[in-house]
């Protein structure tokens, strides 16, 4: 038997398809999401419906976003789900989640077994819509979840960490082995819950500045911030902001990055 075929569908490598088949894991994820009738539930990448079916059983209506035309067609003809689903056959990276929430009249509850090849850019896309999102539950590569939940002074701590924790409270839910999927991926997976802050503990006036600083610092993460951010801050300015200039990018907390972003917004670096 071809281990890339499940329920008659051939897993497409270009879409990063690995289908969840472990019932215990499926039940655990649905329990973590705890969907309730009347909520605006949106699934990204429903695939063959492993999560769609048990979540849909609890809902009157739900929305799914599926890029694969064949899988979208299967869902449109699903005997139990077809009358409940609003299907968007498109790339989730092109979805305006704010419009979707406005149409629903409430913030969205987003979940999915995300294709690992697009998980990081998709997270950044979703972060730009956190005002329209109540919470998110995602199956991701375990290494990505480790980065999302990391603290300073660790190798996993990076730009994704800072931006995720700026926007959301990030909570690991469970780890998932490769054997829970068909075909089995070559990496371990994990489920994470992201809850956008109702009141941001580290408000930033211009998020683009935070993005710029973190990109620059972590692109040169082995350098001290005195060097990696030298065109933006003098060593004296870093010291005044409570940051030792000999620290590296991974040693600086989310709160400190936010402080740097707000200071730079108020004191733009001179053009070189």
Curated annotation (Swiss-Prot):
Location in the cell: Cytoplasm
EC number(s) recorded for this UniProt protein: 2.1.1.182
Top-level taxon of origin: Bacteria
Catalytic activity as recorded in UniProt: adenosine(1518)/adenosine(1519) in 16S rRNA + 4 S-adenosyl-L-methionine = N(6)-dimethyladenosine(1518)/N(6)-dimethyladenosine(1519) in 16S rRNA + 4 S-adenosyl-L-homocysteine + 4 H(+)
InterPro entries given in the database record: KsgA/Erm, rRNA_Ade_diMease-like_C, rRNA_Ade_Mease_Trfase_CS, rRNA_Ade_methylase_Trfase_N, rRNA_adenine_dimethylase, SAM-dependent_MTases_sf
Catalytic class of the enzyme: transferase
Chain residues that bind S-adenosyl-L-methionine: 18, 20, 45, 66, 91, 113
One Pfam family cited in the UniProt record for this chain: RrnaAD
Entry function: Specifically dimethylates two adjacent adenosines (A1518 and A1519) in the loop of a conserved hairpin near the 3'-end of 16S rRNA in the 30S particle. May play a critical role in biogenesis of 30S subunits.
HAMAP family with a match to the protein in the record: 16SrRNA_methyltr_A
Family recorded in the similarity comment: Belongs to the class I-like SAM-binding methyltransferase superfamily. rRNA adenine N(6)-methyltransferase family. RsmA subfamily.
Protein's recorded name: Ribosomal RNA small subunit methyltransferase A
């Amino acid at each position: 038997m071809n281990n890339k075929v499940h329920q008659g569908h051939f897993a497409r490598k270009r879409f990063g398809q690995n289908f969840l088949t472990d019932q215990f894991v499926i039940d655990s994820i649905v329990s973590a999401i705890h969907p309730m009738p009347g909520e605006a539930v949106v699934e990204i990448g429903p695939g063959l419906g492993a999560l769609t079916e048990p979540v849909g059983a609890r809902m009157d209506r739900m929305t799914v976003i599926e890029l694969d035309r064949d899988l979208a067609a299967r869902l449109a003809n699903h005997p139990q789900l077809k009358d409940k689903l609003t299907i968007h056959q498109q790339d989730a990276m092109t979805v305006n989640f704010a419009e979707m929430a406005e149409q629903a009249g409430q913030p969205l509850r987003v979940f999915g077994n995300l294709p690992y090849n697009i998980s990081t850019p998709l997270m950044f896309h979703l972060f730009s819509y956190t005002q329209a999102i109540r919470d998110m539950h995602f199956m991701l590569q375990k290494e990505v979840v480790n980065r999302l939940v990391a603290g300073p002074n660790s190798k996993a701590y990076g730009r994704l960490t800072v931006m995720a924790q700026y926007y959301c409270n990030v909570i690991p839910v469970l780890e998932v082995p490769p054997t829970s999927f068909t075909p089995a991926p070559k990496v371990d997976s994990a489920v994470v819950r992201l809850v956008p802050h109702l009141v941001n503990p580290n408000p930033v006036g211009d998020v683009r500045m935070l993005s710029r600083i973190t990109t620059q610092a972590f692109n040169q993460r082995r350098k001290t911030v005195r060097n990696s951010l030298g065109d933006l801050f003098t060593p004296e300015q870093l010291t005044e902001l409570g940051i030792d200039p000999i620290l590296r990018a991974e040693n600086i907390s989310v709160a400190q990055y936010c402080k740097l972003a707000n200071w730079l917004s108020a004191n733009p670096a001179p053009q070189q």
